[in-house]
Each structure stands twice: as structure tokens, then as C-alpha cells.
């Protein structure tokens, strides 16, 4: 068993943990072998210094080892944001997920209830009529029969209950805010991940490379959005063929118009569900455009589109043909029958 006191002592000096030390420390926390004081000390020590790629890689290794897995096709994708960007926006990645699924790409989406907005992925899906409190086996059925499934984080990461109270008491962002999107229970190797701060764009791409991902975009909008934004440029770190490259994109690269961040302000789960359904039914406007933009990037990651413009064309067809909305209806039906 790890000597947790020595781990804290090391972090207290400003030293960094090796990947193995981080794996062991997080195993102790998630197994209930560390006290609340010890967990709080380590989490804040890491936060104040700044978590390293090795520390995050080790922590994710533990998260993945303890999660309840879902069976999904090898080419499935996830579209997820860390949340916590404070924007209170509509549910961009959730809407984009249905657009991508409507293009014939399997989506295994991992998410939770709201962090800083009034409506997280789980909240809006429940409001749409999707049953989210289902078993991993039932989620697998959704993925395979509907082409899209939603993995509700608390169901798949039961060991998180050991750190939950400490996280609530700390009431500030910790490494765990980064770990969720990196710990997809379906083990997807193609990911489109939005982060709440630009400082994490490159490091998280490196973490996913360390953990065997094949194709990844990690993004952060210049307006603070944990998605690709319409209001300005978006920083991207792309993992492709084992190499990570960094660049910026703008809506114009996808042939889409810009829109101010306020145009994407969301409401509660019910209001966001109405807005999402309207997009899938063909309503034009900034919400449709931002969903198309994020779907396009995901289609590039999936190898379905060569570039953003082709991705937007495919996404447009997905919505206008009714295919995206059909994926939602199928997910509601399959999850209800689960």
C-alpha cells in the first residue's frame, strides 16, 4: 500500500510525482484508504503547483482501472467538455453528438450533471426523455442499437464516492475536473474534448497519447468556452498518427458565420432540451452553427471528414435529412426498453 504521508510530503516541497506514484496515490483515495484530510491536502497541493502530464496520466490510469466498462465498437467517438467554463451555454457537445451519430459514426458519450451551468449533458438528456440511470450492459445496447449511448459518470465510476465529499468541501476545481473526460467507460480511442482553460489543451492531448488514444482534438475557445466557439478563434491540439500538433481555427475555416457568445446562452434543462430538439428539427441560427462546427471537428477525428468544411456538409445533411433527430428518438426508445 502506498505511503500517503510520504506522497503529501513530496508534493509539499513542490516536487512532482512520477506516473506510478500518482497511480498509487489515486488508487488509495478511490479505494477509501486515504483520510479526507490527506485527500484534500494532496488535491490542493497539486492544484496550487499545477498538475503535470505524468500525474494526470497516473490518475486517469486509476480511474480507468476502477470504472465499470461498456462494450462499444473500436471506432466509436466521444464528444465531451470538462464543464466548469462558467458560460452557462446551451448543450453544445450533446447536440453535436446526435449530429455525428446521424452521419453513421457511433458515439459513446460520457458525461454528468451540470457543473457550472444549469444544465449538463445528463440533465438535458433526461429532460429530452432519455433514461440515463441504466446499467453498463444497457448502455452498450444503446450504443449498438441506436448508434449513440450515454454513460452517466456516477454509474460507471462508483469508486468516486470515496472522494466526492472531499471535493464538495473543497468547493474549488481540482484534478478530478480534468479526469472525467479522459476516463470514458467505453474505452474510446477517438475523442473530441473541450477544456475550461487554454493551459490544458496541449497537456491533455499528451495524456491521451500516453494512454493509447489514436485520434484526438483537445479544444478551448478564445471566449472561454470548453467547445469550439463561434465568437472567435479556438485553440486546438490534435493527436494524429502518433504526433501532436497545435493550431488555431475559426468559424470561417468551416464556412460558418461568427456569433457572439451571448447568442449561445442557455437556460435550465427543460429550456435547453427544447432548444436542442429545435436544432435537430432544422431550426437555423447560432446553436445549429456551433453544433455543426463541433460535429465537423468530431467527424474529422473519426476519419469521416477530410476537413471542417466537409464535416459541416455531412452534419448539415444529418440534420436536414432527419437522421440526427432519428438517433435521438432511437436512443429514447432503446434506453426506455433497457
UniProtKB/Swiss-Prot annotation:
<dbReference type="GO" id="GO:0005829">
    <property type="term" value="C:cytosol"/>
</dbReference>
<protein>
    <recommendedName>
        <fullName>Anthranilate phosphoribosyltransferase</fullName>
        <ecNumber>2.4.2.18</ecNumber>
    </recommendedName>
</protein>
<feature type="binding site">
    <location>
        <position position="89"/>
    </location>
    <ligand>
        <name>5-phospho-alpha-D-ribose 1-diphosphate</name>
    </ligand>
</feature>
<dbReference type="GO" id="GO:0000162">
    <property type="term" value="P:L-tryptophan biosynthetic process"/>
</dbReference>
<feature type="binding site">
    <location>
        <begin position="91"/>
        <end position="94"/>
    </location>
    <ligand>
        <name>5-phospho-alpha-D-ribose 1-diphosphate</name>
    </ligand>
</feature>
<keyword id="KW-0460">Magnesium</keyword>
<feature type="binding site">
    <location>
        <position position="226"/>
    </location>
    <ligand>
        <name>Mg(2+) 2</name>
    </ligand>
</feature>
<feature type="binding site">
    <location>
        <position position="81"/>
    </location>
    <ligand>
        <name>anthranilate 1</name>
    </ligand>
</feature>
<feature type="binding site">
    <location>
        <position position="227"/>
    </location>
    <ligand>
        <name>Mg(2+) 2</name>
    </ligand>
</feature>
<keyword id="KW-0808">Transferase</keyword>
<keyword id="KW-0028">Amino-acid biosynthesis</keyword>
<feature type="binding site">
    <location>
        <position position="227"/>
    </location>
    <ligand>
        <name>Mg(2+) 1</name>
    </ligand>
</feature>
<dbReference type="Pfam" id="PF00591">
    <property type="entry name" value="Glycos_transf_3"/>
</dbReference>
<feature type="binding site">
    <location>
        <position position="121"/>
    </location>
    <ligand>
        <name>5-phospho-alpha-D-ribose 1-diphosphate</name>
    </ligand>
</feature>
<dbReference type="InterPro" id="IPR036320">
    <property type="entry name" value="Glycosyl_Trfase_fam3_N_dom_sf"/>
</dbReference>
<feature type="binding site">
    <location>
        <begin position="109"/>
        <end position="117"/>
    </location>
    <ligand>
        <name>5-phospho-alpha-D-ribose 1-diphosphate</name>
    </ligand>
</feature>
<comment type="similarity">
    <text>Belongs to the anthranilate phosphoribosyltransferase family.</text>
</comment>
<feature type="binding site">
    <location>
        <position position="93"/>
    </location>
    <ligand>
        <name>Mg(2+) 1</name>
    </ligand>
</feature>
<keyword id="KW-0822">Tryptophan biosynthesis</keyword>
<keyword id="KW-0328">Glycosyltransferase</keyword>
<dbReference type="InterPro" id="IPR005940">
    <property type="entry name" value="Anthranilate_Pribosyl_Tfrase"/>
</dbReference>
<keyword id="KW-0057">Aromatic amino acid biosynthesis</keyword>
<dbReference type="GO" id="GO:0000287">
    <property type="term" value="F:magnesium ion binding"/>
</dbReference>
<comment type="subunit">
    <text>Homodimer.</text>
</comment>
<comment type="pathway">
    <text>Amino-acid biosynthesis; L-tryptophan biosynthesis; L-tryptophan from chorismate: step 2/5.</text>
</comment>
<dbReference type="Pfam" id="PF02885">
    <property type="entry name" value="Glycos_trans_3N"/>
</dbReference>
<feature type="binding site">
    <location>
        <position position="167"/>
    </location>
    <ligand>
        <name>anthranilate 2</name>
    </ligand>
</feature>
<dbReference type="InterPro" id="IPR017459">
    <property type="entry name" value="Glycosyl_Trfase_fam3_N_dom"/>
</dbReference>
<feature type="binding site">
    <location>
        <begin position="84"/>
        <end position="85"/>
    </location>
    <ligand>
        <name>5-phospho-alpha-D-ribose 1-diphosphate</name>
    </ligand>
</feature>
<comment type="function">
    <text>Catalyzes the transfer of the phosphoribosyl group of 5-phosphorylribose-1-pyrophosphate (PRPP) to anthranilate to yield N-(5'-phosphoribosyl)-anthranilate (PRA).</text>
</comment>
<dbReference type="InterPro" id="IPR000312">
    <property type="entry name" value="Glycosyl_Trfase_fam3"/>
</dbReference>
<dbReference type="GO" id="GO:0004048">
    <property type="term" value="F:anthranilate phosphoribosyltransferase activity"/>
</dbReference>
<feature type="binding site">
    <location>
        <position position="81"/>
    </location>
    <ligand>
        <name>5-phospho-alpha-D-ribose 1-diphosphate</name>
    </ligand>
</feature>
<keyword id="KW-0479">Metal-binding</keyword>
<feature type="binding site">
    <location>
        <position position="112"/>
    </location>
    <ligand>
        <name>anthranilate 1</name>
    </ligand>
</feature>
<dbReference type="InterPro" id="IPR035902">
    <property type="entry name" value="Nuc_phospho_transferase"/>
</dbReference>
